[in-house]
Amino acid sequence: VPALFAEKARVATLDAAKMAGIEVISLINEPTAAACYYASLPNVKKITGNVLVFDLGGGTFDCSMINIQGEKVEVITSRGDKWLGGKDFDKELINVINQKYKKETGQELDIENKYSLYMEMAEQIKRALSIRDKQAEVIEGPAGPKKIEISRKEFELSIQTHIEKLKMLMEEVLDGSGLKPENISHTLLVGGSTRIPIVTKTIEQVMKKPPLKGVNVDEAVAAGAAVYAGLQSKKSLNEAQKQAISNVK
């Protein structure tokens, strides 16, 4: 569950699992799960000490400071915005596309009635701009199809307000933990939106070092929860074996 989940939300999660017939051994905070995932990777240097988990998904943002000592993972403090994510970047891109289309044709796009179509196209452009400086797409509109080109710089300018919000929340986490960037060993990335260059650049500016890369940020939490479950199952099995041996005696 998100680290920011209050007790009521955690209870609701447990109730939902129970209704679905799922036996819950324990709830794990998403930053803790992400840390378990990174720690399980053979190609990643051992993660210990104070770690920042930066989780930017499609619809929400969570930033947590955690402390790792061996198998013990403690969430020190968390900040976030449950209404800030990659979809907000897509909406800003739609506005840019609409402005360019209007400049070319004199007419605006019918965003209200074709919202899903334009959101899908905006996401495609956003992903393309993570690996190249410019992207051109043929946009269907009331004045007919028009080829529109958008640069990474234009995209970054359109989402600047959201980037500043991410930066502010990161700084709040640092203040809340009483730690400085030099006291943080790693920044762990979670969520597909962390692939956006301006996002990782902002993290590096705040933390004074680049975040860890080269991992599957989309599946970090789910994979980490599986690793955690495996560790819990192993402990349970070991305890059961010890109990069985004790009973034989």
What are these regions (language model features)?
Residues 1-249:
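Oxyanion-binding/catalytic loops of NTP- or PPi-dependent enzymes
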